[in-house]
């Protein structure tokens, strides 16, 4: 059972989602509908995008806690650009560029300057948040044009253009990691950095690329946030980094690197969003969301650690049991002296 859970984290997350769906369906029979599914998917888009970026970083055995601030900074960037008269495409591209530069800077700190990822991104978390507040003067950005809001307006099968783009990104990144040598380089880098270097993997480039793509995904999440609510508060992105990490760990991405899939992280993000919908259904205050996210993250980390220890213990027991069985068999085998009385008598005479 432990091996099944350890080796099928995506299936376990999917089972949890289906179980939660079933429980909510019992509470509210109107919950089972296409509208409910599309609503949850729309709500999960920001977390899904952040989970995609966090997966790339965590696979390389790093972590980025500045993505919430990058999300807020890029949301402010697109909002200010639009209000300054720039077009929608130019504003979005500018925000994506800002996110990529922010992620690239994180990668430089970790890869070239050898600063631990958690320390480097804690510093840039405050740096990017402060820059966001400097740009806005601590004020909200309102009056965003309708063009931006149209990105989150349902068009086909009740899914918005951003929703279709998100699904395309999921499929593309899943294929990249699972079917290309470049994608497998992320796993090799996180599993054994020195070994990957000896095999010719450009580990520094892989890690910088992971952080840069994480910044791009955070920027895209900021654009989605602005398009969904139509304004940009001065606290945009607060706490999203913890939810992104929780979604990844919940979906089977190891904090030790080299393990997990994009699909698992997406399922984790979907499950966390579904939990938020439960809070709405139960009419609990919104501030419970952060508490639940932290509780889920802590619980999953404890469970993951205990599960990994249990699996490793079982593997050791099986290995030692095989050696013990071989030793017992060798002890029971008759020796040459046991089968040859003459040899036994010579041995006794020698003694």
Curated annotation (Swiss-Prot):
Protein's job: Part of the ABC transporter complex LsrABCD involved in autoinducer 2 (AI-2) import. Probably responsible for the translocation of the substrate across the membrane.
Annotated protein name in UniProt: Autoinducer 2 import system permease protein LsrC
Stated family: Belongs to the binding-protein-dependent transport system permease family. AraH/RbsC subfamily.
Organism, as annotated: Yersinia pseudotuberculosis serotype IB (strain PB1/+)
Locations listed in the record: Cell inner membrane
Bilayer-crossing regions: 14-34, 39-59, 70-90, 93-113, 115-135, 155-175, 213-233, 252-272, 284-304
Cysteine disulfide links: none
A Gene Ontology term for the protein's cellular component: plasma membrane
Keywords, sorted A to Z: Cell inner membrane, Cell membrane, Membrane, Transmembrane, Transmembrane helix, Transport
Pfam families: BPD_transp_2
């Amino acid at each position: 059972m432990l091996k099944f859970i350890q080796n099928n984290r995506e299936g376990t997350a999917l089972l949890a989602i289906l179980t939660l769906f079933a429980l909510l369906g019992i509470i509210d029979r109107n919950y089972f509908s296409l509208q409910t599914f599309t609503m949850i998917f729309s709500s999960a888009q920001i977390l899904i995008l952040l989970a995609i970026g966090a997966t790339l970083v965590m696979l390389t055995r790093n972590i980025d806690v500045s993505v919430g601030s990058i999300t807020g900074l890029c949301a402010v960037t697109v909002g200010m650009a639009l209000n300054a008269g720039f077009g929608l495409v130019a504003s979005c591209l500018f925000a994506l560029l800002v996110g990529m530069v922010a992620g690239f800077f994180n990668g430089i700190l970790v890869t070239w300057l050898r600063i631990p990822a958690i320390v480097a991104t804690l510093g840039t978390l405050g740096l990017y948040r402060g820059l966001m507040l400097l740009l806005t003067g601590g004020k909200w950005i309102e009056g965003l044009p309708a063009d931006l809001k149209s990105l989150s307006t349902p068009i086909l099968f009740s899914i918005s253009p951003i929703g279709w783009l998100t699904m395309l990104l999921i499929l593309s990144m899943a294929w990249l990691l699972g079917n290309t040598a470049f994608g497998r380089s992320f796993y090799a880098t996180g599993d054994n950095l020195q070994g990957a270097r000896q095999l010719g993997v450009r580990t520094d480039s892989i890690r910088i690329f992971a952080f840069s793509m994480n910044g791009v995904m955070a920027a895209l999440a900021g654009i989605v946030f602005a398009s969904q609510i139509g304004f940009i508060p001065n606290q945009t992105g607060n706490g999203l980094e913890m939810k992104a990490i929780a979604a990844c760990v919940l979906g089977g991405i190891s904090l030790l690197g080299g393990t997990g899939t994009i699909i698992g992280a997406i399922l984790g993000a979907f499950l966390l969003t579904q939990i938020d919908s439960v809070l709405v259904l139960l009419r609990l205050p919104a501030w419970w969301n952060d508490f639940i996210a932290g509780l889920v993250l802590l619980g999953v980390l404890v469970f993951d650690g205990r599960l990994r220890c249990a699996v490793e213990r079982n593997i050791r027991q099986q290995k030692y049991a095989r050696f013990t069985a071989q030793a017992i068999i060798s002890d029971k085998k008759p020796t040459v002296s046991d089968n040859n009385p003459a040899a036994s008598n010579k041995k006794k005479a020698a003694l």
